[in-house]
């Protein structure tokens, strides 16, 4: 059973145990989660796919799904994830298939649930971090539109952007 703070934020998951760091990357992640509430790993593009960034700690701190986004540079992705974290601190919740423009003026984005089959490959640090939980942690992918504001599931979406963000809502 989770315990809620006076703000309604999740402060502790009953079966969560902080993992033990085995290297400097782990120590940095655990330090960031302790100090800021979350950490943002960035994975660079390679032959298997586009770059992506994701949160570690949103579920522990806020009871909110972790967030992943693809195809944006590290500084921009980090800015978006930190903006989401700032909104979570005020009690805002982002839900699947909820289009929003609160992250950037004139820029809408949407959120889709990430299929659990993608967790190990794309959210490996989250899998490590939450391994003590009896149930899988939730995760959402932030999906951004093409230059005309269309999303990948819309018929006129600019096909050139498909290579920058693989949709992870299906296996």
Walk through the language-model features, giving the residues of each.
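Acidic, proline/glycine-rich low-complexity IDRs
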Residues: 2-49, 59-63, 68-171
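A short, structured beta-strand/loop element
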Residues: 53-57
């Amino acid at each position: 059973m989770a315990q809620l703070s006076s703000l309604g934020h999740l402060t502790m998951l009953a079966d969560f145990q902080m993992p033990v760091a085995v290297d400097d990357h782990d120590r940095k992640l655990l330090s960031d989660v302790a100090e800021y509430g979350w950490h943002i790993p960035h994975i660079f593009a390679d032959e298997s796919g586009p770059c992506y960034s994701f949160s570690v700690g949103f579920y522990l701190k806020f009871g909110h799904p972790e967030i992943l986004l693809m195809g944006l540079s590290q500084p921009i992705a980090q800015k978006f994830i930190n903006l989401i974290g700032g909104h979570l601190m005020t009690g805002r919740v982002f839900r699947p298939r909820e289009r929003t423009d609160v992250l950037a003026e004139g820029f809408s984005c949407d959120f889709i649930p990430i299929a659990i089959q993608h967790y190990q490959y794309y959210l490996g640090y989250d899998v490590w971090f939450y391994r003590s939980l009896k149930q899988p942690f939730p995760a959402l992918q932030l999906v951004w539109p093409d230059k005309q504001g269309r999303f990948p599931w819309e018929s006129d979406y600019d096909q050139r952007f498909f290579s920058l963000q693989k949709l992870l809502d299906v296996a």
